Amino acid sequence: MALSVEEKAQIVTDYQQAVGDTGSPEVQVALLTANINKLQGHFKANGKDHHSRRGLIRMVNQRRKLLDYLKGKDLSRYSTLIGRLGLRR
């Protein structure tokens, strides 16, 4: 259920700050959000898959930590990212 190479490359090019940027918080949060959305679809069909649910919770927590970091570092980048991804925060 992981993202394909093409999907990852598309997300990286959409959210990168400069060419070759794969480690900025924006890129990491966008990749985690795509993985989370994909896993949510998996759980609609496989409700008893508790091992994958643990991984989902871990991804959600990692995304939350990265968003908190970005919010403390640069509020305008945080607000832009939240708007682009459609997150509730």
Swiss-Prot record:
Keywords: Ribonucleoprotein, Ribosomal protein, RNA-binding, rRNA-binding. InterPro entries: Ribosomal_uS15, Ribosomal_uS15_bac-type, uS15_NS1_RNA-bd_sf. One of its GO terms (molecular function) is structural constituent of ribosome. HAMAP family: Ribosomal_uS15_B (MF_01343_B). Belongs to the universal ribosomal protein uS15 family. One of the primary rRNA binding proteins, it binds directly to 16S rRNA where it helps nucleate assembly of the platform of the 30S subunit by binding and bridging several RNA helices of the 16S rRNA. Forms an intersubunit bridge (bridge B4) with the 23S rRNA of the 50S subunit in the ribosome. This is Small ribosomal subunit protein uS15. It comes from Pseudomonas fluorescens (strain ATCC BAA-477 / NRRL B-23932 / Pf-5). The gene is rpsO.
